[in-house]
Amino acid sequence: MKTFLPLTSSDMTFYIACDLNDISWFDQIDFHPEDGIVFFASGVFYYFKKTDVEKLFTAMAEHFTGGKLVFDATKKKGLKSMLKTWLKGFEMKDINVYFSVDDVHTLKEWSGHISSAVSNPYLTGYRPLDKRYGFITNIVFRYLDRSKMCQIIELEFD
């Protein structure tokens, strides 16, 4: 039996179970622009169509002025690899992936309220690689980061 840490809310952390395309979940957040807000979404947007992601990001940028959204993404070429290796490899035949980011700067064009769009390396950008991963694995990690096959994107709203 596996034991998982419970997701608990605190004064600074709040979890919402919802349909992201129904933006009524915005109303569940006691948001004050002077306090700021950061949204983290890991492994989420791959499964959304680009038009749905654009609508969501635009609505978030307008509603959460002064906030930030941090999420992971891949290039279009990376989606094909993801579909082939991850999803089909685990026999997830009914699942598809759609959303990718080839040029992070195009995200700013979606809304005048997106003031900054920055791409950071996914595997090497926040923690240095070390010997425990092995030589070949470190080379693969560096390639994935340099090619933007894996990236962490930060959007700032104003």
Regions of interest found by a model, annotated:
Residues 2-158:
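Alpha-helical subdomain
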